Amino acid sequence: MVMLDHPLAVTMGDPSGIGPEIIAKMYLRRPDKRNWIVVGDPLVMEHAIANLGVAVQIRRIATVEEAGCEDGVLNVLASSSLATLPAVGRVSAVSGQAAYDAIVTAIGLARQGTIRGIVTAPIHKEALAAAGIHYPGHTEILAEQGGAQHVAMMLANDEIRTVLVTIHCSLADAIRKADFPAQMQAIRLAHEGARALGIVQPRIAVAGLNPHAGEGGLFGDEEIRIITPAIAAARAEGIDATGPWPGDTVFMQARLGKFDVVVAQYHDQGLIPVKFMGLEKGVNITLGLPFVRTSPDHGTAFDIAGRGIADSSSLETAFDYATRLKVPTPFFSGAMS
């Protein structure tokens, strides 16, 4: 048996959702790429395999060093040990805790350097809350537990990439939080994230916050007071940032090849264009961590969980991105002024 060398870890996600199923399907569909382990609950993964009716054995491992590459064997490092399976397609504290335990375990492995990075299957925010775990989402867990000071979300597919200035908060809060430091953080991380994807001199487009990028102050002055000065400061650092560009047209220009990355001001401004082009194509990359992290661009899909019809394409794309990404440099991992 060939032992795995510095593998990626795939966290199982919420056990009541489609995460375990799409992980099992990825294993079956990608026999050529198996330098990875699952971090999660062995019972959950055994059930996911059995539900697909395939002959795959779960190898329970206690350390990454025990993982080997062998046909028909899926390595699972136990982050929890459930006595019974949680109900499929329902929010539960048990599922929330198990999902959280998998993430924290994988973060520990990444910080120790025993794995190359993490690919996370979807979690359910209500399940986390039910378990008494109060994080808005994966990004915030990874930032705090991963010891990162500055993080940002990059959503990417084959045609466009976007980085968010603000992430999981209300629109009212996003307007308040989109200040000068937040602009600088997003622009810097967009630049370094694109470089991690192999783009040597990234062209960064910064979207405006208001309609028509404020129309010269007629529809709001954040572009004048905050965004334009941040772009100028980024350019002084050698970053090719331009804007602010109207949010309703900048993604089309990026898709046509004018820009490599769009810095979007708030969650839906950035995610709608990427997701409109197909959930199976989109990947979430967390910038600013001291290790690689990607995830599929969809949720737990409770409505189809346990039915064997979930599509693993987005998870596979996330895995491919994780293998392509360069291991973060000190600047990329948040060591910024």
UniProtKB/Swiss-Prot annotation:
Record GO biological process: pyridoxine biosynthetic process
Record key words, sorted: Cobalt, Cytoplasm, Magnesium, Metal-binding, NAD, NADP, Oxidoreductase, Pyridoxine biosynthesis, Zinc
Highest taxon above the source species: Bacteria
Binding residues for a divalent metal cation: 168, 212, 267
Top-level EC class: oxidoreductase
Family: Belongs to the PdxA family.
Any one of the GO CC terms: cytoplasm
Binding annotation for substrate: 138-139, 275, 284, 293
Annotated pathway: Cofactor biosynthesis; pyridoxine 5'-phosphate biosynthesis; pyridoxine 5'-phosphate from D-erythrose 4-phosphate: step 4/5
Name listed for the protein in its UniProt record: 4-hydroxythreonine-4-phosphate dehydrogenase
Organism of provenance: Beijerinckia indica subsp. indica (strain ATCC 9039 / DSM 1715 / NCIMB 8712)
EC number: 1.1.1.262
Subunit structure: Homodimer.
Miscellaneous comment as given in the Swiss-Prot or TrEMBL entry: The active site is located at the dimer interface.
Function: Catalyzes the NAD(P)-dependent oxidation of 4-(phosphooxy)-L-threonine (HTP) into 2-amino-3-oxo-4-(phosphooxy)butyric acid which spontaneously decarboxylates to form 3-amino-2-oxopropyl phosphate (AHAP).
Gene name of the encoded protein: pdxA
GO molecular function list: 4-hydroxythreonine-4-phosphate dehydrogenase activity; metal ion binding; NAD binding
Required cofactor names: Zn(2+); Mg(2+); Co(2+)
Signal peptide: none
Primary location group: cytoplasm
NCBIfam families in alphabetical order: pdxA
Location relative to the cell: Cytoplasm
Catalytic activity annotation: 4-(phosphooxy)-L-threonine + NAD(+) = 3-amino-2-oxopropyl phosphate + CO2 + NADH
Cofactor binding note from Swiss-Prot or TrEMBL: Binds 1 divalent metal cation per subunit. Can use ions such as Zn(2+), Mg(2+) or Co(2+).
Gene3D superfamilies linked to this entry: Isopropylmalate Dehydrogenase (3.40.718.10)
